[in-house]
Structures are given as C-alpha cells and as structure tokens.
Amino acid sequence: MTRLLMLVEGQSEEIFVKHTLTPHLAQHGVYVQPPIVLWTKRLHSGGGVRGGVSNWSQIRRNLLPLTRDGDAWVSTLLDFYGLPEDFPGLPEALGAGDPREKVITLQERFAAELNHERFIPFLALHEFEAWLFSAPAAVEAHFGRAHIADKLNSAVHQAGAPELINHGSDTHPKAQLRNLVGDYKETSDGPTLMEKIGIAAIRAACPHFDLWLNRLEDLGGEAA
C-alpha cells in the first residue's frame, strides 16, 4: 500500500483528513498517516482552536522532514485564502485572472520550491470551508435554520462555483458561514458537515479539489 504524509493547516483539516479522506483513499490502496497540523491557536473566546500559517519558512520547515521519510508521498491541505505574504509567487497570484489557473500556477511554484519528486502540493480554493457550499441543503439541515440553503445557493450562483467564492474579508466562505450561523464552530461543525456531504458531492461541485483527489487516488496504482 502506498503511504501518504499530509501537512494540514489546522484542526478542522486534520479531522477531515482522518475521518473522511483517509477511509476514502484506503479504498484506492493509499494509506494516509496521521496528518501533521501546521499550526493551531486556542481561541480566547473558548470556541476551540484555529489553524493558520504565519510565514513561508514555517511551511517549508514543517514539510522538509516529511520529504525525507523514505518512499512516502507528501501532500498539503492549506488554504489559498490567507496564505502568508511571503509565500512564493503569491503577489502575482493575487492579481486579476482565473482563480483556478492562478492557484494551479501557485501550486507549481510550491512544488518547484520543495523540489521533491513525491510532493503533491494542494491549496484549497479559496479555503477549506468552500466545500460546505457544495450542499447547501445539508448545511441548513445540520443547523436547523430556515433560509440558510437559499443564501448559500445565492453565494454560489453569484461566484459561479463554491471554489470561486472570493478573498474578501467579509465574503470568503468561512466569513459567510459565520454571518449566517453566529455559533458556527469550524473544528466541529465543519468536519461533521464534510462527513455528511461526502466526498462524491464535494468533488462534483469543486473541480480543483477533484483534480487533487484524482491524483491521490492514482497513487494506489503507482510503485512505491
């Protein structure tokens, strides 16, 4: 079985990898070892912990040991939204243009910086919580509040797709969820909803995620 090491941004992504991604990839012959969480900070409000990335050197410093682990493959689950300003190629990626093309270019730059043949970089477009917009009805049912689905559908329609919901400080996916659900808890509600929505629905609505998942699934058929 092919081994895969993961560097993830925070606790929400860690839970998603453990509970949703790992069992899915196991069906394809890929064993995901417990992910490494890049950084977490306990909130003063008592609302759990928040992931985040402070600078490029922090990312590189945490990735390099993974690239030295024998025949294992390495991947990441980091948000495009909120990347540190010194991330290689980020200034150009924040300019005008198709977000999907920009994030792919940024991932290519990421791969070049690490220069490791078994590294598969992935940056969630625009952030992890965008995947929840794949199934607005499931989000509404989870919180038991009317009209949430309508508002999420409206956001998706306006952007064009869940992954295209933008970088605005008040309009990025997590901000919109918090505006709709004041007590949204990213480390519990987010991963729970991901399980309810399921991989199939997320990949159908999020082509950038689907590209990454296809690549990871294919590892099961490659020689170690």
Each language-model region and where it sits:
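Catalytic nucleophile-elbow at a beta strand-turn-alpha helix junction centered on a G-D-S/GDSL motif
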Residues: M6-I15
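C-terminal accessory helical subdomains adjacent to catalytic cores in phosphodiester-
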Residues: M1, E14-G46, W56-A224
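Short, flexible loop segments at the rims of nucleotide/cofactor-binding pockets, characterized by
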Residues: R50-S54
